[in-house]
Every structure is written in C-alpha cells, then in structure tokens.
Amino acid sequence: MSSSNVEVFIPMSQENTNGFPTTTSNDRKAFTEGAVLSFHNICYRVKVKSGFLPGRKPVEKEILSNINGIMKPGLNAILGPTGGGKSSLLDVLAARKDPSGLSGDVLINGALRPTNFKCNSGYVVQDDVVMGTLTVRENLQFSAALRLPTTMTNHEKNERINRVIQELGLDKVADSKVGTQFIRGVSGGERKRTSIGMELITDPSILFLDEPTTGLDSSTANAVLLLLKRMSKQGRTIIFSIHQPRYSIFKLFDSLTLLASGRLMFHGPAQEALGYFESAGYHCEAYNNPADFFLDIINGDSTAVALNREEDFKATEIIEPSKRDKPLVEKLAEIYVDSSFYKETKAELHQLSGGEKKKITVFKEISYTTSFCHQLRWVSKRSFKNLLGNPQASIAQIIVTVILGLVIGAIYFGLNNDSTGIQNRAGVLFFLTTNQCFSSVSAVELFVVEKKLFIHEYISGYYRVSSYFFGKLLSDLLPMRMLPSIIFTCIVYFMLGLKPTADAFFIMMFTLMMVAYSASSMALAIAAGQSVVSVATLLMTICFVFMMIFSGLLVNLTTIASWLSWLQYFSIPRYGFTALQHNEFLGQNFCPGLNATVNNTCNYATCTGEEYLAKQGIDLSPWGLWKNHVALACMIVIFLTIAYLKLLFLKKYS
C-alpha cells in the first residue's frame, strides 16, 4: 500500500455485496423531504491532567480532527473502534458536547442549528434512562406532558402516544412496567424501544442514538435496527454510533462513517465501502462481515485482512503493531482525503453552506414548552408513583421504625422521676436524635440514583432544574422523613411515660421532623452531583460522628475549650437534643420526697429539671427552646441551597 498522494478514484455507483445476496427492497430510496445535517471542519480538543502532582499543566488531547460529512434522511451509521471518537462525534452533532475546545460548523439544511435544537431533535442514550417503576405508557405520557406544547389537548397527546406505541410495536406491553432490579418488566428490546419512543413523542426529523444495540442479543439488536430502518423510510434522519454490527444489520445502513483516532477513514454510501477499500489495496474474503473487516483494517489486524504486500510493508510492522497503528491510521486518512468520495463530499458541503463562513453557536440554552408549575406537578406525580411502585425501601423503613420504636419503648419503659430517670431520659432523647440523623443517610440516593436520568431529561428540555429539585422534595423527601418521625413519636412517647401534655408531645414530634429534614438536607448537599452512593454515605457518616461528640451528652459543652467550642454550632444532633431536653425536663421534679430545706443543702443532687438544664448550659426561657428549631431551619435552607446550586452547575455535557 503506497503512501503517495495519488488520487484513489472509486465510481460512486460501484457496489460490492461480498458474496451476500443483494436486497430487492428500495432501502436506498432518495428522500425529497427531511432534514439534511452537514458538519464542516469539526475539531474537538480536551485538556486532560498529566498527573496527580499539583502544578502540572493539563495536556491538550485531540479527540476529533477536521471531520467533514453529510447525514441525509436514512440510516447514518458511525462505526469505529473503542476510543475512536464515534460517540464524541455523535454528541457534537447532537449539540450535547461541552463547547469549550470545539470548532467547526454543524448545519441543518444549510442553516445554523436553532438554539432549541437539543429539544427539537431526539437523542437516545446508550444506557436506557426510563423510569422502571412506571409502565411503558406512563413513561410516554411523562414525555408528552412535558415536551409537547400546552396548546395541544390531552386527547391529541394521547393520540400521539398511541401512534408511537403502535409504530414501535409496543401494544402488548403498553401497560406493563418497564422493570427494575426488584421488579420484573419488559424485555431488553422492548425497553430500548420505549427509550426510542420517549424521543419520538416530539416527532423529530433528526434522531440520534448512542450504540442502540449495546446489551442486546443479536436477534433483538437486528429487530431494533429494522425498526429504525422503517422509521428512516418515513423521511427521518437517523444518526447513530455502533460497534461491530453483524451483516444483517450492516446491509440496512444507507451512509457509513468510519472513524479511528479522531480521523475520518471513510464517509459515503455504506454499500460502496467494500469497493472503496478494495481499490485502496484491501480485499475482504468472501462471506466475511464487512463491519468486522473495516475494523480489522483500522486496527491493523493483518491476520484477518488480505493485504497487497508492497515493498514498504516490512516485517517489523507485523511484529510491533503498536508502532504501526498510528502511521496506518494516518495513511488511511490520507487515502480518503485523496479519494473521489472526499472530493464530492466537500463539493456538496460547499453547496450546502453557500460558501459562506457561519458563525459558531454555543448550545447551552434550553427552551421549555411548559411552565414551572406544570413541570413541578408532573415531576412530583412521577416521583410519587415511583415511590408507590417500588415499596420495598419505604415499607422496610417503616417496619424498621416500628420495631425499633417498640424495642426502645421496652428498654426505657416507664421512666421514673428520680436520679435514674434523669440519666434514662437524657439517654433516650440522645438516641432519638442520633437515630434520626443516621436514618436520614438514605437520602443520599435521591439524586445519585437518578443522575443519568436527570441529565438526559434536563438537556432534552423536559423540565427546569428548579422543577425537578422541588418536585423530588415534595413527593419523595418530605413524606419519607415525616412519616417515620410521626410513627416513632407515637410509639415511644407513651411507652416511656414522658411529660403528659399535648404541647410537649407535638413539640417532640416537630423536633424529630426538623432533625430528620436538616440531616436529609445535609445528605442532599453532599450527594448532589455524585455518581457513587458509597462515597456520599461515607462522608455523611464521618460528619455525623463528629456532630455526635458536640451533641451535649458525650461531653458537657460548657467544659469544652473556647478554641473548639465553636464546632458545636455546626452539630445537627446538638440542636435536636437541646430542644428535646428543654421540652422534657422543664418543670420536672426528680426528688419528690425531699423538702426545699434539704434540697438547698444537698447541692450535689439534681432535683429539678431546671437544675439539670442549667448545668447543661441550656437557656430556660421559651427562646431557649425555639432557637434550636430556628437554627435547624436555617441549616435546612443552607443545605438545600447548596444541593440546588450543585445540581444547577452540574456538568451536564460530556
């Protein structure tokens, strides 16, 4: 194979079936309508850290280099080895890549993409991000409610949903749950079609898919591509990345783009790719899968490729493939640049752009078709359905709360009004406070588990960050922290025989709720934006352990050195424990058999609740009680603000 710059001319009408039967259907139908997406001189560079040592400057890495091409209505496949840049190119075309380090133009029918392109086009991610606790129809209803304009009636939206269900062949499973790790649901192919249906609700003219066959068996993968082929015949421009498709899938492609190391190896009609590489010096054995053959060429796998051995193909290139890979990719890229395919593509690109330099648009704006309140209602509705549809966690939490309440009630049953009563009251109130904190650690999952779902739906214009944030709080966080506090108070309060007044009972319940909400808010502030639950859980546990030390039971806060005492003001258990002590001890008498004279002489004995509170440094006034709730409320606001800002500024583009 020569590296000279001699033009490799391959007639555009040439077709090579490689021994396979030709298709008689009009798979290569020319579309007169539909969107034509063209990309001009796309370059993408990222800065990566060169090491863990501080002070090292990041190194710039080229991901895509001068990529040009045209995607017309039909099936447009982007093929390449792992790390070749196919997913990066797909994200660039779909306006879902971080614009920093990106240059070049992407045009739709010769014009710049609209600012709401991400919302008008469809994008199916590699990992299916659908709510598994909902049915197929309910998932599509959620997409329709938030992505279709409010001017459409519910009847029109339902007609659109039914049409999508029928088009995707989901009629039999429309009312079946998609499925989770705990709930058996639809098959993998039906789940993938549901993900596609979520995007088809808006009837996009361009549909992007990131490796739609990943995780599917060969038969299911073939069925998914046949579905996409039928959709492309309706005039849709379908662009997708794929890795090693079998021949029955490959023959469905209308256009093929081959990438390696961010360079363009081939771009043109898929059925003419074999003839192109054969004229370039590569021959595919009969009945070999063309897609595998192309990857073998790019990877330099000479054991599977029959090469025209020229004088410059030396034995060292076979022995040391790592030294040969980069030059081989460069040679293939140069051969393509010298081919007639590249020349005709450039001429068509020039015609589409009108020869004018377009202004690059940064696509970070997201438009919404619905109001904040409408989005809030639907996010809350879906979250509540998800809670009811996956009752294992919620029911388990309630059962554990009931059992733990009964155990604590049995241990501290019938508190006495003596010196032991003081110790036992302080102990059980401390336990109630710390238990509320540690049971709130589960709140870290609220945003971590749905991170991919949130990012995809936010970029696609389903809802605002604020709608999602408050919707999750109202439907998930509030009820799941309120109910255990109510149950715990009702069980424990009367079994322990605490102060028998209604106001004391409800103050205790309110205090436990505030502790649970503040601890959960702290969990959200730590976990928001995280990808791993275990990391957030570990950080939460460490924080609560330090907070316990400054809660007021393990050490008397009045005895702590001044240079450390300020840490008590950051302790959630301290505020809860102080409020519970103020509520329970105020007005109590623990020495009913002693008169005032004896009580005055026995300064070492604590006979009243006021004395105990004074020794703990607790203010006896009503403000001494309510200031703890004010502090907890302030912490809730601060932590929720941090969580919201972390979601708002979360890196949503790859």
Swiss-Prot record:
Residues 37-286 form the ABC transporter domain. Keywords: ATP-binding, Cell membrane, Disulfide bond, Glycoprotein, Lipid transport, Membrane, Mitochondrion, Nucleotide-binding, Phosphoprotein, Translocase, Transmembrane, Transmembrane helix, Transport. It is a multi-pass membrane protein. One of its GO terms (biological process) is riboflavin transport. Its main location: membrane. The keyword Mitochondrion applies. It comes from Macaca mulatta (Rhesus macaque). Its EC number is 7.6.2.2. This is Broad substrate specificity ATP-binding cassette transporter ABCG2. InterPro entries: AAA+_ATPase, ABC2_TM, ABC_transporter-like_ATP-bd, ABCG_dom, ABCG_transporters, P-loop_NTPase. It is found in: Cell membrane; Apical cell membrane; Mitochondrion membrane. GO terms for cellular component: apical plasma membrane; brush border membrane; membrane raft; mitochondrial membrane; plasma membrane.
